[in-house]
Amino acid sequence: HDAVRPLVSQRILNDVIEALKDHRAIDVAIPSADTIIEVDDKGYISSIPDRSKLRRGQTPQAFDRQLIADAYERALKDPQFKTTDDCGVVRKYSDEPVFVVRGEESNMKLTYREDTYMLDKLFQLKNTEPQDISHVGDIFRDKVAVVFGGSYGIGKNIVEMLEQSGARVFSYSRTENHIDVGQREDVARALTEAHEQAGRIDYVICTAGVLNKEPLTTMDYATIQAAVQTNYLGTVNVALEAHPYLKQTEGKLIFFTSSSYTRGRAFYSIYSSTKAAIVNFVQAVAQEWDGDGIKINCINPERTKTPMRQKNFGIEPDDTLLMPERVAEATLRTLVSDCTGQVIDVRRKVEN
């Protein structure tokens, strides 16, 4: 059951495999944040070990095949054989030292019923860092991208960066060419136009969204409807209309959420709730469309310097905000990745 660690990260797996190049036995462990005590038969503390030297074991473990085979061969001949894991077998029945790779607190084990509830919540909040794109070369050259919300802010930076990378980009927005993602027929018309002119569509990116910072009770109902129409139904419309084109190319679909998706915030309840809905939608549709070869992910930038933010929050110091160019770069990184159904965090680089 110790192998049931559904949140094991790719970093841990990579580090374990890399360690096998120099070591024949590998364990994964993390420091103990709690004091560990040893208790005697009567229930009293008999010793308090120095926790700086203690680690909590995790998985995976990895071994040279012949090493662990020989260790188990000896163990099974021992009538007193008793162990809790493979590293214990190797330590007891061989002279090979076991190298320890750093684990992660989130790499928790599913053992008790209560663990399922905690893991389910962690799965909901699971996010991913965008991968490096320095090695991708001309991967965007001759690709065709459609960007909704490409006239300003993050969308405009994505358009510019894709064009600089050699892609053919079609940009649509209400201000640019009267395309409203809240209207399904507008989305259909835009995608049809792009496909007729380019012959294919490889990427569809939707950055379109509206934010109204206002108490719910003072919001005009038409404003509420418009926000839901653009932020959430716009996402649904883009996904539905993009599906047949992206199925042909096994393409990529990108939407945008907000850091407020994990917890609603006062004075922008509609915005926060639609952003939470987008995450849930992306996770669900990623599963539905996996067989079609379509990768769908969600970019989650922290507070970003955009016209929409400035309109609602005024002028803020640049060093407290993420620049839209960094979000655009993270979006391109996500386009070249194989992940799907993920929330991609984009954070400021904080200098020490």
Language model region names:
Residues 215-216, 220-225:
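Substrate-binding pocket helix/loop in short-chain dehydrogenase/reductase
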Residues 263, 284-294:
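Active-site-adjacent segment of SDR/Rossmann-fold oxidoreductases
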Residues 151, 159:
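N-terminal Rossmann NAD(P)H-binding glycine-rich loop of SDR-like oxidoreductase domains
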Residues 207-213:
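Conserved NAD(P)H cofactor-binding loop of Rossmann-fold oxidoreductase domains
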Residues 239, 274:
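Active-site helix of classical SDR
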Residues 298, 315-352:
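C-terminal helical subdomain
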Residues 7-99:
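Conserved core of the sugar-phosphate nucleotidyltransferase
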